Amino acid sequence: DKALSAIDKDKAFISALVYGVTERKITLDYFIDKYIKGKIKPKVRIALWIGAYQLLFMEKVPSSAAINESVNLAKQVGQDYYSKLINAVLHKIDNDRKIPDDLSVKYSVPQNLINMWIKQYGEDEVKAFLPCINDKPPLFAIANKKFVNSDELLYELECSNVVGEAYDDFVIIENGVDLTKTKAFKNGLFYIEDLSSYNCAKALNAKEND
């Protein structure tokens, strides 16, 4: 059903936006505070977070859509007075997307935590692992071999608008998708597992019902 598919896509988008803003708050505040001096209302900052996150980290979202939706959001929560400010700040961020090399700002990690890590592990080690800190691990849909192989599972998932890639006896899917809502999951065609658990089971030659 097209309507349900659209709803699921909206839910996935909103979920990615909420988690993304939470993870990248330090980076977002750097850009917002660069153009706004002094305190701003929490609702206004939230609208700016949402717009700035889309501009900086969601390449598929057009700038105009990110800015317009944030302005509309502010109006919907009674912040019409600040709509022009939000519009102006987001346009400035859109024209100035370069994230500085400062480790705290670049990776959205509190400065005191970075200082502690550097003291414990050294600056080179910290710089090496920080790029991975915000990476989202992929999901592994393990095919239930009673019913399907990985290629057949991929086909079933694609029928639910899920994009993935088939390997051995599993399908790798980018995170941010609710696989439990798919018809394939409800029909028991696969189960969800992280890579470490999967590798442990393979190493132990785990059999069904073990």
Question: Locations of the language-model features?
Answer:
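Rossmann-like S-adenosyl-L-methionine
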Residues: 152-210
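Class I Rossmann-like S-adenosyl-L-methionine
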Residues: 1-178
